Amino acid sequence: CHFKHRKQRFVDIGDSLLTLKLTHALSSSVQNFPSDAIKILNRLEELDLSNNRLRNVPDNSFHFLRSLKKVHLQDNTIEMIHRGTFQGDIHRDLTEVYFSFNSVRNVQQHTFADLIQLEQIHLDDNRIESLERRAFMNLKSLKRLNLKGNKIATIAYETFQNLPELEDLDLAYNSISSLDFNIFDQVGSLGMFHVNMSHNKLINLVVAPSVPFEQDTGLGGLQNIKVLDLSFNNITSVAKQFFRPVELSLMQLYLGHNKLLNATKDLFGNMPHLQVLDLSHNSLYELDFDTFRNTKKLQWLDTSHNRISEIPNDLFRFLGNLRIVDFSHNRLRSLPDNLFRETGLERLDVSHNLLGKLPLTSLSLASAQTLSELDLSWNSISSLSHGGQLARFKCLSWLDLSYNRLGQIDAGTFKGIPRLASLNLGHNSQLTLEINGLSFQGLEYTLLHLNLDNVSLSQVPALSTPNLLSLSLAFNSLPTVALEVAGNISSLRYLNLDYNDLSAVPIVTHSLTELRHLSLEGNPITTLSNTSLLGAANQLEELNLKNIDLTVLESGAFCKMQPLRTLKIGVYRNIKNFNIPSILQFNDGLKNLEIHVTKDTDTLDNEMRGAWPLKLQNLTLSGKGLKKITGKMFQGVRSPTFHLTVRNTSIIKIPFDVFRNMLPVRNVSVDVRDNILLKNLQNPSTGSKPGKPRSAFLTDLKLMGGKWSCDCDLGWVEVWERKRRQYLCPVLLRVSILRNIIVGTLMMVLGTGCVRIKITGVWLKFLRVILSVVGVKLRWRN
């Protein structure tokens, strides 16, 4: 569109048009905002000129648009927003303004002022270096101000003036080197105020000199910040009383991924409403005994990934609201007696430390009775002798003792834990179990998940656990699994037998009628016949056969497995004319396929030639043996939606032919993380936009972990990101980066690396607490 005869362009609809969208519509030669053509649209409420090449927006561009509510100008090349562009007496209905992904360098005084209905301003991913005083002024309805991804180094006092309803101020990914709470003196006094200053250049947090209070302009008093995120900076020291202005308001404080050395009462001891404190990934050596003296509402404390070697006995005295404590990845050799005195503790993580014994005496009877999850993995615990103290854990449902030095589990050890549902004893290589099953006495009807990986088993112990859902026996020396085992684990749905001495698929799988997931990776199985999987064929949904040197694979081995949804296999060189599509021709429901290559292989053209199952939409290629992929390998893809993962291979280049030959594909996503040799990935999109006939568009891309060169071969990524924002990321659906970080933090804790991540009641309850502070409502069904 060149806007010839601009004044006549919208004459006929000037009094009726409410919404005008010209995204990616203007000629590249149009650099000036087309105000002459648009000014006659006097009833226009929403204007979208995003994804063009606009450079200049004159200050009178919107003066005739008195009904304007939303302005979308993101993804242009705008260099300046002139003072007076938006005026309070004209734009009384304006609610949202988007200038994201432009080239704005500064925000002048009164650029956004006296706009009584304005709720959102988005200036993220520009080149803003400075914010002038009173740049944002008298915006009484403003709730979100997004300034992330700029070059802001300092923020002047009174930059934000009279913004009483502000809830979310995002300053992440800037160059801010100092923090003065005085800049928030007139911000967020009436709402739940969140400040995100993560990923900046903060080093030393010092107390700023006080600023004289102006009665006629300021709101005065202490700050109303509820959530403060200072993570991913370089903070090495925090001055005493630094948090004094926000002590009475803070509910969540995030200081993870910094370089703090200690935690004291002067910093965290007087925050009466603080519920969440994240000090993870620092260099903490110690916590003072009175660190939380008057911070009595603390519910979640994370001090993981530090250098703490000792915990003071009185650290948690009188903290009756404490629910989750994470001491993992430290240097603790013991925990003091009665460290946890109050009732209410639900999860304790002391994994990856140096504990030599169970810290049972660290919990009083009151705290032990409410504990639901206990993680003691990766320590040096050698004995579970407890003198009956385990019986105090009446609510314990999740216990992880993996990667310790346990030698023996006596009969009835867990008998006093009536609700234990998940038990991990894996990787205690010297562990001796009672073959008659007495080691698990008392857990017969409560145990749902059991991990016995790498515990030197030569036979499966007797398990009288009819409700057991998952059993992991990987990295043992099992030559077989006795058929009689099935009778006592009749509800089993997941069975992991990786890296044992199995020479054939165990017949016991034929009797496990509820089995859905079976993993046999790394066993010396050489033959897979038409009857090997016959017993499980009618219900199995996932099968892992990686790292197996098959010499015989009968053509009907998988043909009866109609419910199969996920298959992981290798490239079996000892099988003549091995072809994957041919062995899967009857698996119409297969959606996910992983092909693992261990031995050096140039291509898989022959192995992958042919038509793939119609619903196959996720293909993973893994293994150092794979050196090259070609377009011929993907000619058989038939699903219109396709996700390609290339993980931990020796591939150097992924050519365009790979994607050009996926003829039926319309939406493609690519994950090429962790390929240390990969240097070149050509554009997977064969069309210029989504929905274009006979072409595919890239919907998602993950690149981390390669040896990428920022040259022309990778330059397409920037153009694609622009199009993705335009077509796939509607502005109205964008979520606050602060909320993402908070939810992401929870998900990182939840992702324990277990075979099955179990979101327990502890986390569901606490998730509500966290998200309620950031304005997100959580619902779930039991």
UniProtKB/Swiss-Prot annotation:
LRR repeats lie at residues 16-37, 43-64, 67-88, 93-114, 117-138, 141-162, 165-186, 191-212, 224-245, 249-270, 273-294, 297-318, 321-342, 344-364, 370-391, 395-416, 419-442, 446-467, 468-488, 491-512, 514-535, 539-560. One of its GO terms (biological process) is cell adhesion. SMART domains: LRR_BAC, LRR_SD22, LRR_TYP. Keywords: Cell adhesion, Cell membrane, Glycoprotein, Leucine-rich repeat, Membrane, Repeat, Sensory transduction, Vision. It is a peripheral membrane protein. It is found in: Cell membrane. The keyword Repeat applies. SUPFAM superfamilies: L domain-like, RNI-like. InterPro entries: Leu-rich_rpt, Leu-rich_rpt_typical-subtyp, LRR_dom_sf, SLRP. The keyword Membrane applies. Glycans are attached at N196, N234, N262, N454, N488, N530, N618, N648, N667. One of its GO terms (cellular component) is plasma membrane. Required for photoreceptor cell morphogenesis. Mediates homophilic cellular adhesion. Belongs to the chaoptin family. PANTHER family: AGAP008170-PA (PTHR45712), INSULIN-LIKE GROWTH FACTOR-BINDING PROTEIN COMPLEX ACID LABILE SUBUNIT (PTHR45712:SF22). This is Chaoptin. It comes from Tribolium castaneum.
